[in-house]
Amino acid sequence: MNHPVAVALSDFSSLFLQAWRDTGHGFPRSEDLVGLESPCVEHDSGDEVTWKPITRQPQGDLAGVEKGIEIELHKDIIDFYSTQFSGDMAAKFGEIELDLLQVFSEQDGVRLQENILGHLVTQRRLKLKPTVFIGVIDSADKVIAICNLTGEVILETLGKNERDVLAKDVASFLQQLVPVVREA
């Protein structure tokens, strides 16, 4: 796990966990994850799940996406989604509040790959540069994404060629995130 993205993601995950501890909540909690199996689940009460990010061993891959659309994904995209299991993590990047998307389990990884593949197929059809989403904001038509060509992290308007560069790469984006604690 010495790739800069894996290190930055692990560092942010540690900050996220510490933010939850500092507010007296212990582990992050979610009602949305109840009943889902994952190696990062600490406890499932039936009403809410407590979880913590854990290193994924062995590291996953996104070969299904690459094969499905016949494209080589940027290494940062692969490392972002394949080095740990975690629930989504709330964060702020400057004034932008977002949920950093994560892979919760192997089954969730399959679903994620299907969603990424659909996103890339739509972009190809619309003749847009390929991106892969890594975060969602409180807007139905915008996502935080990684440009597959440059590795830049961008704020992208879905279905349009409107993109604002947020960071030159994923590691520097992750290093600028501030954890946000949202109670379930």
Curated annotation (Swiss-Prot):
Q: Does the keyword Membrane apply?
A: yes
Domain of life of the native organism: Bacteria
Q: Where does the record say this protein resides?
A: Cell inner membrane
Which CDD domains does this entry report, sorted A to Z? Syd (cd16323)
Which cellular component, as a GO term, is one annotated location? cytoplasmic side of plasma membrane
Task: Give the membrane topology.
Answer: Peripheral membrane protein
Which keywords does this Swiss-Prot/TrEMBL entry list?
Answer: Cell inner membrane, Cell membrane, Membrane
Q: What is its main location?
A: membrane
Q: Name one Pfam family in it.
A: Syd
Query: What exactly does this protein do?
Result: Interacts with the SecY protein in vivo. May bind preferentially to an uncomplexed state of SecY, thus functioning either as a chelating agent for excess SecY in the cell or as a regulatory factor that negatively controls the translocase function.
Q: Which family does it belong to?
A: Belongs to the Syd family.
Q: What is this protein called?
A: Protein Syd
* Annotated source species: Photobacterium profundum (strain SS9)
Name of encoding gene:
syd
